[in-house]
A protein has these predicted regions:
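Catalytic micro-motifs at enzyme active sites that drive phosphoryl/nucleotidyl and oxygen chemistry
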Residues: 24-26, 95-96
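An amphipathic, aromatic/His-enriched active-site/gating alpha helix that lines ligand/cofactor pockets
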Residues: 3-22, 28-33, 40-84, 128-141, ...
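Short, hydrophobic/aromatic beta-strand segments
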Residues: 2-4, 121-122
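Surface-exposed interaction/gating patches
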Residues: 86-164
Length: 197
């Protein structure tokens, strides 16, 4: 984990910045152990992306990274990536830092929507889900459309175990599955609204 934060790009101006590295160890859903890295290309848009991709050229890579790349390769066993674009309302890395958004638990949603509707769905997330989940201690740290297809979105939330437990318990109670807490019908209504996409 520590090696990732030593990536030389972290110290170079106008290059991507690591927004977060999340480690799925167990009981989180999906295959584990697994690492999810979120890189922020910065304010230069596609020009910034091009600079970052260009430095990965095989001839330049060794000179740029030195031994860092070889050491990192010891732990890498495969994986996949998704090039994502921040939707309107998604905070930048600088905004996350400025607002002091932190979490002890990060909830990642990789969702499939009808082709052609990702931005409409994400606008609804910003309008409805962000304030609702905010009442349960969840702060959106990434609201992204997947740029390689027309049917996937990624939403990342910073929260705590207590925040996630409270949200899930209120949802279950609203569905009649539990009487531990008071149910929140708005959570079920949000799920029904989001399912329309």
């Amino acid at each position: 984990m520590e090696h990732l934060w030593k990536d030389p790009v972290e110290r170079m101006p106008e290059m991507q910045r690591l927004q977060g590295s999340f480690y799925v160890c167990a009981q989180g859903g999906g295959r584990w152990p697994q690492v999810i890295n979120i890189w922020d290309i910065g304010s230069k848009g596609w020009e910034g992306w091009a600079k970052n991709v260009d430095r990965l050229n095989l001839k330049r890579r060794k000179a740029f990274y030195g031994d860092w790349w070889d050491t990192a390769a010891q732990w890498r066993t495969g994986g996949f990536d998704r090039l994502c674009g921040a939707a309107p309302g998604s905070p930048s890395t600088a905004e996350i830092a400025h607002q002091g958004i932190t979490g002890t638990l990060f909830v990642h949603q990789l969702l499939t929507v009808r082709p052609g509707t990702p931005l409409d769905y994400l606008a609804t997330v910003v309008e409805q889900q962000v304030p609702l989940w905010g009442e349960y201690g969840h702060r959106a740290t990434g609201i992204y459309e997947v740029l390689g297809n027309q049917h996937e979105v990624v939403v990342v939330w910073a929260t705590s175990i207590a925040g996630q437990t409270g949200l899930r318990a209120a949802r279950d109670a609203a569905r009649g599955l539990s009487d531990e807490v008071e149910g929140d019908d708005r959570l079920v209504a949000w799920e029904q609204r989001s399912a329309a996409f």
